[in-house]
A protein has these predicted regions:
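Phosphate/pyrophosphate- and phosphate-bearing ligand-binding catalytic cores of soluble enzymes
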Residues: 143-210
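A gly/ser-rich beta-alpha-beta helix-loop segment of oxidoreductase catalytic cores
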Residues: 1, 37-38, 42, 82-126, ...
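C-terminal substrate-recognition/cap domain of FAD-linked oxidoreductases
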Residues: 199, 207-210, 214-427, 433-437
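A generic beta-sheet turn/junction motif
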Residues: 41, 62, 403-405
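Short, hydrophobic/aliphatic alpha-helical segments
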Residues: 14-27, 82-99, 103, 192-217, ...
Length: 437
């Protein structure tokens, strides 16, 4: 339970909160919308809401395709502002109509578009922060020489640069990071601090003549500095013509093997829904009408989106994708979805997460394995081994989300009112962590 909740009106208020917390040895928990699922925005210190007063767009450079915002701006509202300029902020979570940029940076959020537009860390250019001593510091891309100059500063900022250098300059540290951190091909990763980003710099054995500490703040969940302004790189909006192929499969494993084929096709979306999620929508008045694309009773459906600047081009892309799946004997039905119907399918996919909470009875799909990611080529084997583990415990799970990125959200169906299922909760999560590793 938090000790207190604060709603700072300006940067001076944040500095006062930091001074008070430091003096009294209390933690601060920066918080925006609180839509994350793993407890990142709760704690026993002072919860600091920036969602009320830090909601402004500070600057916008249309030519450079960059924008600077305060952390409390909502992701979809930002994109509504950018729409007339045919630009947008790419990372797209299922909570995009309420999640905020500060939280997305803290979590290194990604969402359904990451296979095309990357994750939040990729879009962060600089972050204006308040440090633990109350000083105001901007972290941005700087040259290796500028990094060394920062190390000479007799300030808290200088001590940060010195600490980074002293930790990473040794070959042994660099080798340990390379050994223990995820493969570079695993793009979706928000576990721990992204110190492996620094190994790209020529300071630490890489080839880049620059380094950016803001990349470390992305995914740090507000533990390193208090963000007050964030500069983002924007993307041009998706080509105007798109087709969504809804590929139906008789098993989860078949759909994941098919993903290896689909990802050769320059997709904009590659998302998985399993039978359990689809079944949750049957009796929902709002979503039942969005089930129009389903044929028979698939165990899994992949949502595969292609896009181009003309309908002729996009039809060729869609037909090539379907032909490739059929040639490799994957799936039993591949329906092409057009126009406004595409958003209806995505609405069903987004609603699925919330509808899981309406499962009848005490058994619920428990959010405890949210962002395990593996290399795409390892995904079928990983899920096969996870399913075998669940079978050994005589348990079922929900499988959904970001197949094309090698990240499936897995939700064991447990009754946490029963002691034995609470024990299983711990066993399943621990064994899954080892399995991913």
């Amino acid at each position: 339970i938090p000790l207190a909740v604060a709603f700072p009106k300006d940067v001076a208020d944040i500095q006062q909160l930091i001074a008070f917390a430091t003096k009294n040895e209390i933690t601060l928990i920066p918080r925006t919308a609180g839509t994350s699922l793993a407890g990142q925005c709760v704690g026993d210190g002072i919860v600091v809401y920036v969602s009320k007063h830090f909601t402004n767009i500070l600057s916008f450079d249309e030519e450079a395709k960059t924008i600077t915002v305060e952390p409390g701006i909502i992701r979809d509202e930002l994109n509504n502002y950018l729409k007339p300029h045919e630009l947008f902020f790419g990372p797209n979570t299922s909570t995009s109509n309420r999640c905020m940029i500060g939280g997305m940076v803290g979590n290194n959020s990604s969402g359904s578009t990451s296979i095309r537009y990357g994750v939040t860390r990729d879009k962060v250019l600089s972050i204006d922060t308040v440090l633990s001593d109350g000083s105001l510091v901007t972290f941005a891309e700087i040259s290796s020489d500028a990094f060394k100059q920062k190390m000479e500063l007799e300030t808290h900022e200088g001590s940060i640069y010195k600490a980074i250098y002293s930790e990473l300059i040794f070959d042994s540290a660099q080798e340990e990071i390379k050994k223990e951190f995820p493969k570079e091909t695993i793009h979706r990763r928000n576990t721990g601090y992204a110190v492996d980003e620094f190994l790209k710099s020529d300071l630490f054995g890489g080839t880049k003549p620059t380094i950016n500490v803001a990349k470390l703040l992305a995914g740090s969940e507000g533990t390193l500095a208090f963000s007050i302004a964030i500069t983002l790189q924007l993307d041009e909006v998706q080509p105007k013509e798109s087709i969504l192929i809804t590929s139906h499969f008789n098993s989860i494993n078949e759909s994941l093997k098919a993903t290896l084929i689909t990802m050769r096709h320059n997709l904009y979306t590659c998302e998985l829904m399993d039978k359990a999620i689809l079944d949750c929508t049957k009796n929902n008045r709002e979503q039942a009408k969005n089930r129009f694309f389903l044929q028979d009773n698939p165990e899994a459906v992949l949502l595969l989106e292609v896009a181009a600047n003309s309908i002729e081009e996009v039809e060729i892309l869609a037909n090539n994708l379907i032909a490739d799946l059929e040639k490799n004997n994957f799936g039993y039905h591949h329906k092409k979805i057009y126009g406004n119907d595409i958003q209806k399918v995505f609405a069903l996919r987004k609603a699925g997460l919330g509808l899981l909470g309406n499962m009848i009875g005490d058994k619920k799909a428990v959010a405890c394995i949210e962002d395990t990611a593996v290399a795409l080529e390892d995904l079928p084997n990983y899920i096969e081994e996870f399913t075998a583990m669940m079978d050994a415990y005589q348990q079922k799970a929900i499988y959904y989300a970001h197949a094309g990125a090698g990240e499936i959200h897995l939700r064991p169906i447990l009754n946490l009112k029963k002691k034995e299922d609470v024990v299983l909760f711990r066993k399943i999560t621990t064994e899954t962590a080892k399995l991913v590793k």
